[in-house]
Amino acid sequence: MPSKCCTIFMTRLICRQSDLVISCAGVAPVDGAFLITADMIKPGACVIDVGFRRIGRGQFAGDVDFAAVSAVAEWITPNPGGTGPMTVVALMQNVIDAARYRIGLARAEYPV
């Protein structure tokens, strides 16, 4: 069996057993298919879709088939619009911390 088939098989098997699935591949779909589909998700799991790809002119999608997987998963992030805003916040915080470090100021503590 080719290694690609083994990789796909193992990915499906591992995802099906997982309580948490985080997908961040951002790969183009084959024949319009999503990387993560409902049959790969354990009922009640949490699915975080970080992957981001262009699917057409001005159209974007994540790695996860949101419509199908949301019927199986207990929690799921939409994409686009799910994890992106949090990524921007984290990046901006890192820029501020780097600037403070550069001029000799201590890293500011922020309440969680």
Where are these regions (language model features)?
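Internal active-site segments that recognize and position negatively charged phosphoryl groups
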Residues: 1
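Non-transmembrane, aqueous-exposed alpha-helical and coiled segments at domain scale
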Residues: 110-112
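Rossmann-like adenosine-cofactor binding region
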Residues: 4-83, 87-97, 101-104
